[in-house]
Every structure is written in C-alpha cells, then in structure tokens.
Amino acid sequence: MKLVIVSGRSGSGKSVALRVLEDLGYYCVDNLPLPLIGTLLAQLKGSNDLVAISVDVRNIAEQGKVLQDQLALLENDTEIISFFLNSNDKVLLKRYSETRRLHPLSKNHISLQEAIKLEGRLLEPIAKIVDHYIDTSALNIYELSDQVRQILLGSVDKELVINFESFGFKHGMPTEADFMFDVRFLPNPHWEIELRPFTGLDEPVQEFLGRQPLVNKFIWQIENLFETWMPHLERNNRSYLTIAIGCTGGQHRSVYIADQLAKRFRQGSKHTVNARHRELNISDTNN
C-alpha cells in the first residue's frame, strides 16, 4: 500500500496536489484527523492500495507529534511519501486577497498577515521532515501539477482519452471539441450516385476516399500536427482531448477521416483512443 501525505501552508496549493493524486487513482481524503490514518488504511486495504491525505495546520497545531506517532504504527509494507507545499508571505497574502477566503487560523481574531506568519511557525517542524518540499510562489496550477506528477511517476506525461468525432455541419457543431477541422473542401462521395447510400465506414467509400491525394495529405498533416504537439498537450493537465472532423452531412468524409485518424493513433499509443460518429450514432472504443 502507498500513502501520500500532503501538508503545507494554506493557499500554497494542497487542493491542487490532491486533485492530481485523485486523477492518478488515489483515494483522497482532505484534512483527515490524524488518529484515523491507521483505520482508513485498514478499511481500504485490498480494495484500494493508493491512498492520499491532506493535513492542514489545525491538525498539526492541535496534535503536535501525533502524525509521526501514527505513521510509526503503520504496517511495514506501507510506502509513505510526503509533500510540503509553501509560498512566501507576500504571495499568500495576494492569493487570499484575490479569493477572499478565510484563513484557518483567523478564528483566533488575528489579522491575515499574522495568521499566515503563525501558520508558518506551527508547520515548520513538518516542513523539515518531509520527502519533497515544493515552493509554489512562482508556480501556476499546471506547473505544480506537473511537479507532483513527475515526483510520483518519474514523468510529467499524462494518459489521455483521445476522442475523434465526426459530425455534419448542417446538424450543428459539437460544443465539447478542443479542435475542429472542416473537411467540406475535400472530394465528396455524395456526388457519386453509387456511393451515396454508404458511409465512411463502408469499403466502397473508403476505397474512393483512399484514392484521393488531397484526402491522404489532409490525414497525414492532421496526424503529424498532433504527434508533434501531443507531449505538450499531455503536460497541459487535461484528461480528455476531443478532435472533431466535420463535413456537410456527417456521413462520408468526416466519418472516414475520423476513423482513419483513430486507427493511426491506436498504433503504439499509450492513450485510450475512441472514434465517435455523431450522425451515425456509432461509437468505437479501443485502447
């Protein structure tokens, strides 16, 4: 079993780190009371071996060394990784001013600046013993996510679900697309009377479009575009990438091209690649 503990000053990005862990398959609990760590792991053992908890100043301040005592009681086969997130006082003041959230120590009737400084003093013993200390002062949420992911996986690459979706413009454009390509300029099988009843998934249409230099060039260029930029899309903290291909009716050209792109991206890909043909009401899911 692996236990990841995320601590740090309020406003430094603990919730961002916890969301990354959740995306990686961890069972996450925010601000778990420290004496319940052992109970939580015992209940999850066998059903979920990846667990992450966040610990804030209210737990640390009130219970002192309870965290270390609780960790010492865990089974020997529990791998523990700890993070401490911090930012300088000026950045934390700015973040709190922008969000207008209450600081956890504000109940002590002290100013925000005093609460931030007090929290730093209370958490200092924890900051000295963690495995990974991350200063988030100059990081945005994507950069912080990348750092956490890289520490845990050794890589910032993230598995994506890539959806290729065909559609017809005359039926409306899809609203969920990240990228959209208009293929209405390509040769249209609709004007070949014998091909009109078929779709882009049928062999006669595939043979017709496969003979068209413009179609092949377009597919190659789209494939090359996403192969070039995929590493950067992986680092963009996204889980889904939807690429929409549109023709007039969503029956021939867009269907064929979306299908061909899905097949090409499935070859040797670590990502889940799906093809969906909206106007045909057909989905093809594969890894």
Curated annotation (Swiss-Prot):
Pfam families: PapZ_C, RapZ-like_N. Keywords: ATP-binding, GTP-binding, Nucleotide-binding. Displays ATPase and GTPase activities. This is Nucleotide-binding protein Sfri_3380. HAMAP family: RapZ_like (MF_00636). GTP binds at D56, V57, R58, N59. ATP binds at G8, R9, S10, G11, S12, G13, K14, S15. GO terms for molecular function: ATP binding; GTP binding. Belongs to the RapZ-like family.
